[in-house]
Amino acid sequence: KQKFLKVLYENFYKSYNPKAADRLGVIYTPNEIVRFMIESTNHLLYKHFGKTLSDKNVDILDPATGTGTFITEIIENTIPKQDLAYKYKNEIHANEVAILPYYIASLNIEYTYKQKMGYFEEFSNICFVDTLDNTLPMSYGKQTNAFSLTSENTERIKKQNERKISVIIGNPPYNANQKNENENNKNREYPEIDKRIKDTYIKNSTAQKTKLYDMYSRFLRWASDRIDKNGIIAFVSNSSFIDSRTYDGFRKVISQEFNELHIIDLKGNARTSGERRRKEGGNIFSDLIRVGVAVYFLVKKEGENGFKVYYNVINDYEKAEEKKEYLKSHKLKDIDFAHIIPDKDNNWINLAENDLEGLLPLYDKSNNHNSLLNLVSIGVSTNRDEWVFDFSEKTLLNKMRYFIESYNSKV
């Protein structure tokens, strides 16, 4: 039922408003991903904090809920019936920026609750708001749509902002830019979040051209600021943060803000070619997007020092259905993760070999007393190269004779 509803919504939205669908990243999340993320989050919650998603004082937020997929899965298969009424009323939260999925999510969540509990209860913790505008504690949502300004919705946002969020889980939009400038379909600006990105991720980057205003970068920055002092962020998104040069500052910053990271790299990057493209395999979103995808879990623990990265990558050449089956048949605790130790340049994979840095340099411009050579020159160089090649052999021979004769006449 969930898959049917999500596919129906996705196809309708793309036909009804294709630009909004593209800008908002309207792609439904496969159930295999949703269940794996929820089960893994539950495992990490218990491992690190001795709690589960069904416990009191564990507030859960889906910041880009779409049709409510993550919330309905939590209600239907994660929280026991005896705990659900309290969680539903107080500690499960969802945000949605578009009116159509907002209504679908509300109905979907309420129907799932009724099916499990046997009676209807309005879900009053879903907010019609652009999460990225809700930059605590500066505002209770700056969205200009009139619906967001109703007193009921404003009170919902205010109530959510007063909660300490322990788990942020979901599938944030990935689409960073339209395909070309003529599409007139750019993502809007978010001054507060973009400033936070500039002051953190970009400030700590060594890349000459660093553009980190992708939607998923914004949601990661927002979630990192919103999560409680003890909590977990569980996202599925573009995987470029794993090895992209422009994300070196991001990798450095999260090592300072979090204590543990688990990554399952699902590959699927279609923006490659040749053998590399074949190794990437199918995209787990049924090849509806072209970027590589990763599922990851960030753990934040108050008073704990250090940062550990655990990395698992899917096998080469696997099809989308094989990747879904991998998530369906594996538990996070049973996955064979590699413990990654970042290098000095904040690389996680494709680590740089730094052995040469300890050797005596041939020449050091800044300190020639600590080098093998103390003089340097540009060596043999050529000039007037156009004199020594030509399309005609006869013309070339004539040029060279003239060149040699001219030189000898000056000696």
Indicate where each model-derived feature is located.
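SAM-dependent methyltransferase catalytic region
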Residues: K3-I264, S273
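Sequence-level detector for compositionally biased, low-complexity segments
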Residues: S124, R163, N180-N182, K203-T206, ...
